[in-house]
Amino acid sequence: MIHHISAVTLAVRAMPEAITFYTQLGFTLVCGSPQARFSTLQAGDALVNLTLAPNFKPAWWGRTIFRVDNVETLYNAAVAQGLTPCAIQHGSWGERYFHLTDPNGHELSFAQLLPQAAQRQG
């Protein structure tokens, strides 16, 4: 039985820039370095692996969604770090969320489950 995704691995053109971006969002570097070809960052139970691919050009679209406790707190922290997320949206499926694109074109979404949706899932 599958329980959950343990990590997402993303190609990056420049490791220092990518590590800076993810640490600005609250991730902690747990393996690797700005000079490494592969690094891992963690926030809660979520792991993001970065693999160096200097000539990387996204040829497809995808989105990684992170569940957060408070979407407004993270949104405000991202803005305070100089990042430019889209405005917080209210999804009809019971989440508040915002999207943000990393320096390599990967779309990230940060979503907070609203109480009524949490009751349906619980």
Show the residue positions of the predicted features:
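N-terminal beta-strand motif that seeds the catalytic metal site of vicinal oxygen chelate
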Residues: 1-16, 64, 112-122
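A short acidic/small-residue loop/turn micro-motif
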Residues: 56, 93, 113-117
